[in-house]
Amino acid sequence: MPDKTYQPTIAGLRAFVAVAEKRQFSGAATALGVSQSTLSQVLAALEAGLGTQLVERSTRRVFLTPQGAELLPHAQAVVEAADAFTAAAAGSTDPLRAGMRLGLIPTVVPYVLPTVLAGIAERRPGLTLRVTEDQTERLLAVLREGALDAALIALPAETAGVTAIPIYDEDFVLALPPGHPLAGKRRVPATALADLPLLLLDEGHCLRDQALDVCHKAGVRAELANTRAASLATAVQCVTGGLGVTLIPQSAVPVEASRSRLGLAQFAAPRPGRRIGLVFRSSSGRDDSYRELAGLIGELISSQHQVRLVK
C-alpha cells in the first residue's frame, strides 16, 4: 500500500527519469554521476514510497511498467522545473549556456547542420548540442517523451503539447538528369510534373509528402518513378542516372550539385517550397530560450543559404 504522507524526492524522480530515458542502469548511473547500487537504492525507495513498480529490471534492458509510462511525463516536468529553479537561483542570465538535445530531419542535417554547429561554437561556446537525426514523426514522439529538448523540422507540426517557432522558408528546385530539356529553365510550371517520372523518398519522410502536395496543388497526378530512395542524396544519384526527377530544397543545391552532374530548374512563381522551424514542448517553460535559439539558427543559415527568414 502506498504511504499517503510520502513525498518523492527530486533525487528519486531524477533517478527514475534517467533510467527511463537511458533504458539501462549503467548509462543512467553514469549520467547522474552515481554508482549503480546507489541509483538502484534511490529508485527502489521511490517505488516503495509510491507503492507501485515503475520499471521492469532485466540483465540487459529496463522496461517501463504501465504505471511508469503514465508517471514519467510528470517526473520529467518536475525535474525540468527543479533544474530551471536552480538555474534561476544561481542568477543565470544565459539560458543557452548548457547542453541541449536537438533533433533534425534527414533533409536538413547534411545541408545546414555544419553551418549551425560552426556558428554556435563561435557565438555560443557554452552551448553543447547533442544531435539526433530522424524522421519527423519519430522526432516528435521522442520530443514529447522528454528525450529531446527541441527539434528542427518542416512545419506545420500540429501536435498537442508542442510549440513551433517558424524560422525560414526555402524554395524547392527541380532536379533533373544531365542534359534534360528543362535543365537551366527558370520558370517551369508545376504542372510539368504530370509528364515527368517523379522519384520520391520512402514513406515517413516529410519531403515525400511535400512533393506530392506540390502535384496536388498544381492539379496534376504525378507519374511516380519505379525507384524510391531512403535519403535525398540517394534520390539525387538516381536522378543523375536517369531514373526520374525529384524535388530538392534550395539549401541542398550547393552540396548535391557539387558532387553529381545534376540538371536543375527553377519553378515558376509562386514557387513551391517548405517552411522550417524549431519545435519544443509547450510545458518546458523555456520559450524565451528556444526563441533566442531559433533566431540564432535563422541568422546562421540565412548567411550561407538562399532562404527567407520568417518575420
UniProtKB/Swiss-Prot annotation:
This protein's record includes keyword Lipid biosynthesis: no
InterPro entries in the record: LysR_subst-bd, Tscrpt_reg_HTH_LysR, WH-like_DNA-bd_sf, WH_DNA-bd_sf
Chain residues forming the annotated DNA-binding region: 25-44
SUPFAM superfamilies given in the database record: Periplasmic binding protein-like II (SSF53850), Winged helix' DNA-binding domain (SSF46785)
Keywords, comma-separated and alphabetical: Activator, DNA-binding, Transcription, Transcription regulation
Pfam families: HTH_1, LysR_substrate
GO molecular function: DNA binding; DNA-binding transcription factor activity
Gene3D superfamilies: Periplasmic binding protein-like II (3.40.190.10), Winged helix-like DNA-binding domain superfamily/Winged helix DNA-binding domain (1.10.10.10)
Residue ranges constituting the HTH lysR-type domain according to the UniProt record: 8-65
Statement: the UniProt record of this protein carries the keyword Transcription regulation: yes
GO cellular component labels: protein-DNA complex
Family note: Belongs to the LysR transcriptional regulatory family.
PANTHER family in the record: HYDROGEN PEROXIDE-INDUCIBLE GENES ACTIVATOR, TRANSCRIPTIONAL DUAL REGULATOR HCAR-RELATED
Primary role: Required for the induction the katG gene for catalase. Involved in the response to hydrogen peroxide.
Protein name per the record: Probable hydrogen peroxide-inducible genes activator
Organism (species): Mycobacterium avium
Source taxonomy: Bacteria, Bacillati, Actinomycetota, Actinomycetes, Mycobacteriales
Gene: oxyR
